[in-house]
Amino acid sequence: KNPEADYESSIYRLADGRCAIPATAFKAALVGAVRHFDGLTMVQAKAALFVSPEEGTDLVPIVGTPHMREDMVRLESGVADIRYRAGFWPWSATLKVTFLPHMLDVSSVFALVDAAGLGGVGEWRPSAPKSASGSYGMFRVVG
């Protein structure tokens, strides 16, 4: 194992070196949060919402300094292993969300983004399908 290489390879970067998260991770969080609201299905939300990435990429820049995390994971075989990944705390991102106004209004989108933040983005987030015990990647609407 090469912890430093594993850590570096876990970071999404824009061409200018800034750290980022795939826009699709934020969209998936938004779509997943729809289950907590009435009146819109996940299929409808998938078609009604779009998270704009940085131009020319599929990434949303984040503000924060990465640090190396050492996480214990369980492989499919049941064997424990160590993963070295980047963690960011504190961190922030500016999301540009486009939506269909005949399906959602601005206040609904803000509420949806806030709810999506409880499920988080990235590894070991609360809404991760295989490990719902994480607390990383959570966010909230500010400002």
Tell what function each PLM region has.
Residues 1-143:
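RNA-interacting cores
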